[in-house]
Amino acid sequence: MLRAHAPLRIAAALYLVFSANAALGQIPDPGEAAMAMVPEKNLCAGPTAPVAVGAAQWNGWGRDLENTRYQPEPAIRAADVAKLGLKWAFGYQGGTEYGQPTVVDGRLFVTSSAGRVYSLDSKTGCTYWTYDAASGSRTAVIIGELGQAKKAYLPKKLKHTLAHLDIIKAPSAAFFGDDSGTVYALDAQKGTLLWKTQLDTHPLARIVGAPALYNERLYVVMSSTEEAAALNPNYSCCTFRGSVAALDIASGRVLWKTYAVLEEPRPTRQNGSGIQEFGPAGAPVSSTPTIDVKRSALYVATGSSSTGIGQSLTDAVAAFDLGDGKLRWVKQLSRPDGAASSGFTNSPILRTLASGNQVILAGQKSGVVYGLDPDHGGEILWQAKAAESAAGGVAWGPAADHRNLYVAISGSMAQPANKQGSLTALDMKTGIARWQTPAPAPACTWGDRSCSHAQAQAVTVMPGSAFSGSLDGHLRAYSTIDGKILWDFDTAKVFQTLNGVKASGGPLDHGGATIVNGIVYINSGNTLLAFSVDGK
């Protein structure tokens, strides 16, 4: 079955199996590779400055609380996108998967599947610090200011003698999750550990979606590799349940945790190998939660059941109370045949229409895109079929400006590909397609074998241009007016890197482009690429 998938899908599937077996103690954990990595060579000169959260940034997965993936102030004109050239390349040590870059206050933060977390200068690419986590990570980092100093940050001898606590500033923190279900908080300036919390003890739990941050709380979702482990007939499937939790940002203390499968797993039957099976289970949450400040709500999109036992929160968009985590409403969007392609792997997007009404936008693996009403229990306002079949629908997520939703479609994963990937602009109010641009014929530097033009990567949009990556390694910019391709760069090549690491690009998947201060950042292979107008 793996032969029918595009190259990065094969890598992803193998990574799932690798991680699952590692958790079961059969092979080494990939995070162990981080301990053998050497220090970076291109260290920044001089002392590091404190990191302040500002307006010109891309913080976390979707850039804003609503997960729009829209950069309103890119410092690049759409007319100049065609002039983008490579500014620099940075090579990652170990691993082949990386979190989407976060850029805040002139600093770039990124995680890696080898466990190393990097803080770079966003303009020059020099290294401020690295931190080696115990397990691999592929979430985006989110930066938060911890505010005025808490008691935990004061020297003990000053607890009762300091007259004005507000003169002491606690550090900004870099938050991320890893493949063991652990959440980390690092000092964003120095890279030292502030705290870490094991959020889920299931051996196959992992955090894929980046945390969301609001009002001194960190909201974290949980996914797993159990679907891959279930391919092993000797594995007792399945007991993992997706969840969302709120943590105190200063201490990492869990304030509440709500499961997407409400019932605890129970013994169900024995499989053909005589192994006891369990259920209900599943509903992994693989994408960053969306914050609705107006309604004090948190929106998450869930995956499918892993046992076939029906549950109301599988294949759904659900709203939870920000304060206590209680379920507000759920809109289940399963296919009638219960196929796994009904699940979601991308974040809901909250957008305000010209009328002042708001809509929740969500794309399904089946290729169906929905507009939901946040004021009436997720009632379907419209739905649109963005893909011709369920073979390859919406993967890591659309982006939305003030007018359109830009949806990338994987098309067919079969080899040879018989259906193209595409980028489609849908009217946010009606779901009607304004334009659709099919992916160009796949052009892979490694040849025709396992070459796909599927567009699974998350989309990024700025005024006038939308960026979408393809599994053939090409990053393209499209006109938001008519879908015309404005710029095309093949990332699947060998690059000379700032830090001397041998690096090359490859298929583009998962995290999309990050745009800040006139620079477009993208991960490809084991390379971080930075583009600017004329490469300057």
Tell me the role of every PLM-derived stretch.
Residues 209-210:
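Extracytoplasmic mature domains of secreted/periplasmic and thylakoid-lumen proteins
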Residues 9-22:
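Bacterial N-terminal signal peptides
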Residues 76-93, 117-137, 143-158, 166-170, ...:
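Extracytoplasmic/lumenal domain signature
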Residues 1-11:
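Bacterial N-terminal signal peptides that target proteins for export
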Residues 27-86:
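Blade/loop signatures of beta-propeller domains
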